[in-house]
């Protein structure tokens, strides 16, 4: 390994890093998804080089792939997006229905996922990006990269329709992933999010084709329009997210990966929702989500303390016997 700086393409990588740092200062912090290409990214030292954007920008520009790569249930949806937004995608996960370069669906997925920036370099991707000025705003260039701000990609927003709840919930394996990826690839389903749990008055839907060779999918949703709600004062601090709403009782989606460690103050939930975001139902005008320890972590710490204590006691007794 010779390091990034010794690579012939280091000036290109360094310029990209400096450009993204400036973009964050001018247009705000947020997650970025870049076009994948093994040769282009590999020339920087590793295809994973852009994953260091959070490091080089002091956490301002989040790396979509670096944040979620092999670490959460968001992974398959990232790679479905990467395939739509890259001329030569990696497609590392098997069992997914990948699309080729498709910026129509790719940009809509960027919006629904709260991705703030899209970075493209190939002639094919940049050419197609020009067709969607209402979704992608070209804000910077760093040869060969074009940097776009994704329009209407709020991190938190009110839902237009009441969520439906999967009757299966989360039962392990691919019980959530398979029907959720089918939902993710079907634009006709996007108005109604499917949750793994929720209030009793939310409609329940079955999961179809579970025992067949056809991929499992959610049954048709019941569409119940919701009143509009305004979400303001959004503050994302990583393990703490806060925001305000102008009315309570209307579900909002938080486009951050769900995990059981999240808890909500001033709202019901959070409930896991397609593809892998969180839904909360505000009960107060100020809502706070925090990521903290659960009984699993506390149990692990207790076992660790007991284990270390047992080793120390055993070592002390052994020392006394030797001394005697």
Cite the ranges covered by each PLM segment.
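Extracytoplasmic/lumenal acceptor-recognition loop(s) of multi-pass membrane glycoenzymes
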Residues: 1-7, 20-111, 154-155, 159-225, ...
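Beta-sheet entry/capping signal
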Residues: 29-32, 115-117, 145-147
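Short beta-strand micro-motifs in enzyme catalytic cores
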Residues: 1, 144-148, 241, 276-279
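Short, polar loop motifs at secondary-structure junctions
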Residues: 121-126, 257-260
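Generic recognition of flexible, low-complexity loop/linker segments
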Residues: 16-23, 51, 104-109, 134-136, ...
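Short acidic, glycine/proline-enriched helix-loop-strand junctions
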Residues: 125-153
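Short, hydrophobic beta-strand segments that form beta-sheet elements in well-ordered domains
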Residues: 33, 116-121, 252-253, 272
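Active-site-proximal, structured, solvent-exposed surfaces of multi-pass membrane proteins
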Residues: 205-324
